[in-house]
Amino acid sequence: MPGWRLLAQAGARVLGCGARGLGADPGLERRKNILFFVRNLHSKSSTWWDEHLSEENLSFVKQLVSDENKTQLTSKLNPLKDEPWPLHPWEPGSFRVGLIALKLGMMPLWTKDGQKHAVTLLQVQDCHVLKYTPKEDHNGKIAALTVGGKTVSRFYKPDSRLEFYRDLGLPPKQIHKIFHVTDNAVIKPGTPLYAAHFRPGQYVDVTAKTIGKGFQGVMKRWGFKGQPASHGQTKTHRRPGAISTGDIARVWPGTKMPGRMGNQNRTVYGLKVWRVNTKHNIIYVNGSVPGHKNCLVKIKDSTLPAYKDSCKNLPFPTYFPDGDEEELPEDLFDESVWQPSEPSITFA
C-alpha cells in the first residue's frame, strides 16, 4: 500500500521527526522537530454551519428551517386560489404530468375471487411542479414540466440552486424529473401533486435505478448455463465459451460478456394501480418495481398502446383538492379488490 494512503487512513495525526531523519545536513540537528499534519480524506467535509454554530444554535436553526419549509408547503396547498393557468379538457392523445414517489416496500393484496397479488407501495412526498418549458425551448415537438420530489435540507445546496427555490417559494428537492406534456395539460409551477393524480384500475409505467450488483460474470449477469463441472474441464466452469468465430475475426457489438450489473435506469410498463391512499399519499401498484427500499421512482401514465387512451376518466390535468370534485375517501380501491373492512366469508 502506498505511503500516502497509509497516512490518509491514519487521520489527522502529528508525526515528528528530526532534520537528520529527513536526510538534511547534520548541522541542522539542533533545529526543532518538524511537524507534519495529515488531513483525513475520509472525514466529513465541514460547512459554514458546522464551523460557526454551537450545538444549541444548530438545533435551533434546523427547527427554524423545518418550520419555514412547512409554511412554504402549506402556502401551496390551494393552487386554484392563486390564479392558476387556464384548465383545458382531456383530448385523445393528451399526455399528463407524472409523479415522483418513494418506494416503501411490498405487501400482499387479495381480490374478491381469492387471488393473491404482490403489490409495491409508492409514497408521494412533497411533490411539486418546479418549471414549465415550452416546446420551442425544449425540443420543438412537445412541452415539458420539471417535477421535484422529497424535501431535503438546504444546508448542502449551492446558492444558485437555493435562489431557484426562493423564487418558487418552495423548499429544496432531492431529485428532479422531466415529464413531456401536451399544451392542454400544462400546470403552473409551484402546484403540488398528490397520489390521487392516479386512480385505481388504470395502468402506469414506473422508472427507477436498479440495484447495483457490481462486476459479475456471464452466469449471473446474463443467465448463461456454464460449462461442465467435470470430465476434463479445467478452470472453465463459469466461463462464457466462444465469443465469436474465426472467419469474421471480430467480436460483434452487444455480445453478452462479463461486466457491471445493475445501477441503471429501467422502466416497468403496464403496472396496474390496485389501491390509492389519499391520507398518506400511497399508491399500490401491481408487481415489483426497480430499485431498493427508500429510493425515488418516476411514475407516469402508461404509454402502451392498449392503455394510451385510459386517461379520459382521470383528473385532468391533475387532481386539485380545492377543485369542484367531491372530497375523496381515505382509500380508493379497484372494483375487484377485497377491502380489509369487508367480511372474508359471505353466505348466500
Curated annotation (Swiss-Prot):
Keyword set, alphabetical order: Mitochondrion, Ribonucleoprotein, Ribosomal protein, Transit peptide
Protein source organism: Mus musculus (Mouse)
Name recorded for this polypeptide: Large ribosomal subunit protein uL3m
Classification via InterPro entries: Ribosomal_uL3, Ribosomal_uL3_bac/org-type, Ribosomal_uL3_CS, Transl_B-barrel_sf
Coiled-coil ranges per UniProt: none
Domain of life the protein comes from: Eukaryota
GO MF terms held by the record: structural constituent of ribosome
GO biological process, one term: mitochondrial translation
GO cellular component: mitochondrial inner membrane; mitochondrial large ribosomal subunit; mitochondrion
Gene name, Swiss-Prot/TrEMBL: Mrpl3
Main localization category: mitochondrion
